[in-house]
């Protein structure tokens, strides 16, 4: 039996999301690699934090941001360093494996929708040998 599991991108809470509307220019850390950086930007768009160019999809980069109503600064960095960088950031979009490894699961605000394009494209598949279900 195969089960589809979405690779979790967790938006880790350092301050309340509502605080972003104050226009204080909060910093949000995202993974610097193209695959996870694009996924992070799509998640931020889904949360209403920013708007990306129409149709940019998973290839989204910081240059594709067309609206930034909360005046956030996107700070791209090595994905593995995001958990340790939380004290210097207001928020971070962190891959599930790094969030879990850092023991910050209690700070998860949201996760990527399992039906999203990103989850459908890059999700993990768990396969079990028949008879070992």
Language-model features and meaning:
Residues 1-9:
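Positively charged n-region of N-terminal signal peptides that target proteins for export
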Residues 15-19:
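C-terminal motif of bacterial Sec signal peptides marking the signal peptidase cleavage site
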Residues 24, 88, 93, 101-114:
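Ligand-binding "clamshell"
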Residues 25-66, 119-122:
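Bilobed "Venus flytrap"/periplasmic-binding protein-like clamshell domains
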Residues 27, 122-133:
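A bilobed periplasmic-binding-protein/Venus flytrap-type ligand-binding module shared by bacterial periplasmic
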Residues 32-36, 77, 84, 118, ...:
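Extracytoplasmic/periplasmic, Sec-exported soluble proteins
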Residues 33, 79, 96-98, 113-114, ...:
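Solvent-exposed coil/turn segments that connect beta secondary-structure elements
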Residues 38-43, 63-93, 97-98:
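Short helices/loops that flank or line small-molecule/ion binding pockets
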């Amino acid at each position: 039996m195969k089960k589809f599991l979405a690779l979790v991108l967790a938006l880790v809470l350092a301050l309340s999301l509502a605080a972003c509307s104050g226009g204080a220019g909060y910093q949000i850390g995202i993974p610097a690699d193209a695959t996870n950086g694009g996924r992070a930007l799509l998640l931020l768009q889904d949360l209403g934090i920013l708007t990306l160019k129409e149709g940019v999809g998973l290839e989204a980069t910081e240059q594709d941001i067309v609206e930034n109503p909360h005046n956030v600064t996107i700070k791209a960095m090595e994905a593995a360093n995001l958990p340790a960088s939380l004290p210097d950031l207001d928020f971070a979009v962190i891959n599930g494996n790094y969030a879990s490894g850092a023991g910050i699961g209690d700070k998860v605000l949201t996760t990527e929708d399992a039906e999203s394009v990103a989850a459908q494209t890059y999700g993990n598949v768990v396969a079990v040998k028949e008879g070992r279900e």
